[in-house]
């Protein structure tokens, strides 16, 4: 990454010390799908390449959701049942996104720990979820703390998916306090940060 200056581990640790969240730093630096933990001043991170037959739609509303407000919406405690629900689905994420198991995408992205609490702060988000599924999304989820919603589709159907989603989002404009949505067509970046 930075050649002789810093190795990848040193760069991850330094960037996490500055930014504070290895789950933000690792994917930006490494690309792909990452799992990361910051423990005793060190980042432990695993990277896998995202299946290149997938495409992504970032659906960005015209309002901002402050991270502080999104964090404050989360409960201080969660039930054991909800924790197990999320952990079991998180275990499916690598197979769904990296091993071509598209049949697992929807269930792997189901959530009971943050989306039910944050979506009420995101006007129109439930309708966006429903519209994306109606347009052919294999999975839909809140990106980070919100307010962006991500939808996942198969590249073989990308043009049809994006076209239908664009038209569908136009129908949702003005709904529930959201005047407009921006649709970003994305592919996974399995390379991460580079220096030229």
Give the location of each predicted region.
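A glycine/threonine-rich phosphate-anchoring loop and its flanking beta-alpha core
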Residues: 36-46, 50-69
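Short beta-strand scaffold segments in enzyme catalytic cores
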Residues: 25-28, 33-36, 57, 149-151, ...
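Gly/Ser-rich oxyanion-binding loop with an adjacent helix/lid
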Residues: 1-44
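Active-site rim beta-loop-alpha module in soluble metabolic enzymes
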Residues: 57-120
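Glycine-rich, charge-dense phosphate/pyrophosphate-binding loop(s)
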Residues: 97-196
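Solvent-exposed alpha-helices and their adjacent loops that cap or buttress functional pockets
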Residues: 18-20, 26-29, 47-52, 85-86, ...
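Short beta-strand segments
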Residues: 28-31, 37, 58-62, 142-144, ...
């Amino acid at each position: 990454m930075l050649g002789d200056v810093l190795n990848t581990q040193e760069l991850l640790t330094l960037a996490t010390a500055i930014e504070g969240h290895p789950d933000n730093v690792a994917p930006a630096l490494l690309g792909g799908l990452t799992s990361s933990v910051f423990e005793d001043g060190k980042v432990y991170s695993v990277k896998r390449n995202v299946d290149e037959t997938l495409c992504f739609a970032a659906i960005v509303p015209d309002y901002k959701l402050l991270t502080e407000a999104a964090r404050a919406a989360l409960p201080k405690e969660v039930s054991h049942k909800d924790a197990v629900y999320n952990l079991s689905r998180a275990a499916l994420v690598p197979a769904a996104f990296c091993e071509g198991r598209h049949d697992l995408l929807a269930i792997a992205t189901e959530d009971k720990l943050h989306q039910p609490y944050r979506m009420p702060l995101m006007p129109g988000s439930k309708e966006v979820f429903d519209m994306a599924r109606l347009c052919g999304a294999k999975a839909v989820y809140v990106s980070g703390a919100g307010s962006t919603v991500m939808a996942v589709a198969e590249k073989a159907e990308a043009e049809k998916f994006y076209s239908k989603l664009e038209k569908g989002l136009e129908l949702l404009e003005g709904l529930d306090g959201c005047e407009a949505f921006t649709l970003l067509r994305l592919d996974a970046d399995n390379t991460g940060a580079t220096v030229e």
